[in-house]
Structures are given as C-alpha cells and as structure tokens.
C-alpha cells in the first residue's frame, strides 16, 4: 500500500537534525487558544542501536528530568512515552499510543523516530516484521496476537502528529534492509 504525506522539513538550528512539521497544526509553539501547557512525545524505536536514547537520558543541560518535570522556562511539560524509560509496560504503555492514533489523547503530540524505518514490505506475507511494538492489531475488534509493526505505528500516528522528528544517524541516513 502506498502512503503519501505532505510535510514541510524544518532544519534544526545546528543543521544536524530535521523535523517534519505539518504547517496546518498549531502544534508546538502554541495555538490561538493560548499557550501550550503539555505535549506528548512518542519515541519509537525502529532498527537502531539506541544510542540517541542513551545520549538523551544522560543529557545534563537541560536534563531529561528537568524536561519531564516541566522545570524549563517557556517550555510545556513533556510526557515522554519511551519503550525503555517509561514506567508502564504492556497494555498500559501502548494505551496512549492508541489514544493518539484514535484522536482521543487530548493534547498535541510529537513522534520521535530513533533508528531506521524497517522495510517490512520485503516479506511475502502480512505477518512478517523486522521491528514491532505491542500486539493485537489496530482494529478494536481484532483477535490477532500478531505484533504491531513499527511501520504501521508510524503511518497510524502521522495524521495527528504536530511534528515528526528523525533523531540520529540511523533514522536520518540508515538503511533498514540491504538486498544482496
């Protein structure tokens, strides 16, 4: 299935990172309704070494704790949904991802992709995957026990995201599958 997203690339001031921002969403800087008080960050691990997770968790200026506790002036509180750093697991961890996907989260969100996007289409059946998060399918009536592919999460979260950020070399330049 072919997907098409029309997003604008906004380079980071340092020129190293880029973010794809939907210009139609008030998003990160605020909205006509007032200042932004909270933003959810859905950190999705593609095919990677997790180096950016390690670097972010060890940052000191600002620290990840200051960011998550809302102690940085003029920035909204960040609710981080990270596969390693989040306190929840299983259904509890996946619940906010599903709320964002369904449009019921109640706050703006950003998707951060660490690692390259897997080429799941290389498999001959619908059950193949390289990288997955959660299980049970995306349809509430589904009774499957198959893993939910990272590529499917990315497509499902895209329509409502205020921004998509590819973080690190693997996400920005990495190859997910090498055909020999």
What feature does the model see in each segment?
Residues 1-27:
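N-terminal export signals
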Residues 22-24, 29-154:
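Extended, subdomain-level signal for the structured scaffold at the beginning of enzyme domains
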Residues 42, 163-168:
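Hydrophobic/aromatic beta-strand patches that form the interior of the parallel beta-sheet core
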Residues 155-161:
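Short, conserved loop/helix-junction motifs that constitute active-site signature segments
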Residues 171-174:
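Short gly/pro/ser/thr-enriched loop/turn and capping motifs at secondary-structure boundaries
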């Amino acid at each position: 299935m072919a997907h098409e997203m029309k997003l604008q690339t906004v380079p980071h001031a340092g020129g190293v990172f880029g973010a794809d921002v939907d210009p139609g969403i008030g998003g990160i800087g605020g909205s006509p309704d007032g200042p932004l008080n909270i933003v959810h960050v859905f950190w999705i691990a593609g095919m990677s070494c997790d180096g950016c997770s390690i670097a972010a968790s060890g940052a000191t200026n600002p620290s990840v704790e200051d960011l998550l506790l809302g102690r940085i002036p003029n920035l909204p509180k960040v609710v981080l949904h990270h596969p390693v750093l989040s306190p929840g697991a299983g259904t509890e961890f996946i619940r906010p991802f599903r709320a964002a996907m369904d449009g019921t989260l109640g706050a703006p969100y950003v998707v951060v992709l660490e690692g390259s996007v897997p080429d799941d289409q290389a498999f001959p059946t619908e059950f193949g995957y390289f990288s997955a998060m959660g299980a049970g399918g995306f349809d509430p009536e589904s009774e499957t026990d198959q893993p939910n592919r990272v590529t499917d999460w990315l497509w499902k979260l895209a329509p409502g995201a205020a921004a998509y950020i590819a973080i690190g070399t693997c996400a920005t330049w990495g190859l997910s599958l090498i055909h020999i």
